[in-house]
A protein has these predicted regions:
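Conserved ATP-binding TGD loop and adjacent catalytic N/P-domain core of P-type ATPases
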Residues: 1-121, 173-175
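Membrane-embedded transport module
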Residues: 93-175
């Protein structure tokens, strides 16, 4: 299930908030497997919940599709709107997913994790390489012009490496 995939991707707590009745909310929550749910929730209650979770030190992602989700989308650390939802929700959200499915959120999480790995790896390489150039220059092993050439070459190489696609080929066709 998508909820299980979100958990495996690092989401610690998944809460459903809905304006629907208790009975409807309970049935949906049980079927999809969220950690907790709240029914008959007003828009300001959603935003208040987001603010309370942030005050506890949690990072909060809010996913919504309607006008009533807009205050919470705005209050969240990251707001995600569904493209078929209300225009105001899409405008307020940080991210808009194209499908009415949480599978896109799982893909976004994996992409963001892969991107951060790439950024940190590139950073470590650049720092190490430049430190090596400085040490070789101080030791008199390479000339300043050679150091500049190697530095610029490494910058170009890292830039080209950074432009490679993170998405698997089958995902690229869908995106």
């Amino acid at each position: 299930s998508v909820i299980r995939q979100l958990k495996e991707a690092g989401f610690k707590r998944i809460v459903m908030m809905t304006g629907d009745s208790e009975r409807t909310a309970a049935a949906i929550a049980k079927r999809v497997g969220v950690d907790d749910y709240f029914s008959e929730v007003l828009p300001e209650d959603k935003a208040r919940f987001v603010e309370e979770e942030k005050a506890k030190g949690h990072k909060v992602i809010m996913i919504g599709d309607g006008i009533n989700d807009s205050p919470a989308l705005s209050a969240a650390d990251a707001g995600i709107a569904v493209s078929e939802g209300a225009e105001i929700a899409r405008e307020i959200a940080d991210i808009t997913i194209k499908k009415d499915s949480l599978d896109e959120v799982v893909l976004l999480r994996h992409l963001s994790m892969d991107l951060m790995k790439r950024v940190h790896g590139n950073y470590r390489f650049v720092i190490s390489f430049n430190l090596g150039l400085i040490l070789l220059g101080v030791a008199g092993i390479i000339t300043p012009s050679m150091s500049a050439l190697l530095h610029n070459s490494s910058t170009l190489a890292i830039s080209l490496k950074s432009m490679t696609n993170l998405l698997p080929e089958e995902e690229r066709e869908e995106a």
